[in-house]
Amino acid sequence: MKRFQLIEIEDQTWLPNSVRDALTDYLQFMTYHTQPYAPIVPQLERALEQTNTRQIVDLCSGGAGPWLSLYPALQQSGSMRVLLTDKFPNVQAFQRAGFLSNGALEFIAESVDATDVPDDVVGFRTLFASFHHFSPAQAHAILSDAVEKRQGIGVFEATHRSALAILLMFLTPLLVLIFTPFIRPFRPSRLLWTYVVPVVPFVVLFDGIVSCLRTYNPTELQVLTAELSSGTQYQWEIGEQRAERAPLPVTYLLGYPTAAEQINGREGETATLYERRSVNFSLCISGFAPRHLDRSAAIL
């Protein structure tokens, strides 16, 4: 099936933040409970070992992505830190993720462009369910930026460019209607955009189908990385990993410098970055969490 770039509604700057946040909250809820990225934990763990780092910079984090379930799995092999970022940061969702992870998940409240990550944001970069949003030129820029700044990068996509994946997307409006009452924190705007004016179910379906049509397959990922491998000490791994009983595989791309010491030399700079940016999380603990969260309640 041919790849189409197309346009997703969630990417548009004119979309109200309340709608975008409702979308990312739903996606994060479903990701947490279905755990589609559990199969790639060994690959990600191996990449972290190759780069000799336990610091992750998650790009295009949406509502915090899969990290509430992935972090405990990765934490078993050693302490680590995760910094959530996005071009349109869902700060309330980031605060909630930080609270539920006891501060392990930190965030940047300002916009971060995945194609040009600030120099002081250092760590192994990850993109979950977001790489397909970018055109080939933008996707190349994301990978090139990681290569130029000598940072490892991992791309993971649970969507698939196939007839089966598109057919499964037609179930999503029903899932939105069923699970929205269970999504926390409660927002009146989420009920408005889901049940009164059903924008969220429509956008989840529309963007889901478009996401499938935009998803890069392994061959296309190899084309994107081909020239980046020329003349650089950078290693790429591309493949698919299927979970037991899962209808579709997860497509992944891993890239990292072969000279890991070039990353190690900047870890002190990363610590400074986390100390400076983590003010956001301390505000979450002192103000946001007690009013809105109860750990004894359902997580999501």
Which positions does each model-derived feature cover?
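Class I SAM-dependent methyltransferase Rossmann-like catalytic core
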Residues: 1-53
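Conserved Class I S-adenosyl-L-methionine
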Residues: 3-4, 207, 211-265
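Class I SAM-dependent methyltransferase SAM/SAH-binding core
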Residues: 57-116
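A conserved beta-strand element that flanks and buttresses the S-adenosyl-L-methionine
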Residues: 125-126
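A short, conserved alpha-helix within the catalytic core of class I
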Residues: 134-149
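Conserved beta-strand signature within the Rossmann-like core of class I S-adenosyl-L-methionine
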Residues: 150-161
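C-terminal alpha-helical "lid/dimerization" subdomain adjacent to the S-adenosyl-L-methionine
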Residues: 166-225, 238
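Intrinsic-disorder-associated, low-complexity terminal segments enriched in Asp/Asn/His/Tyr and depleted
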Residues: 280, 292-294
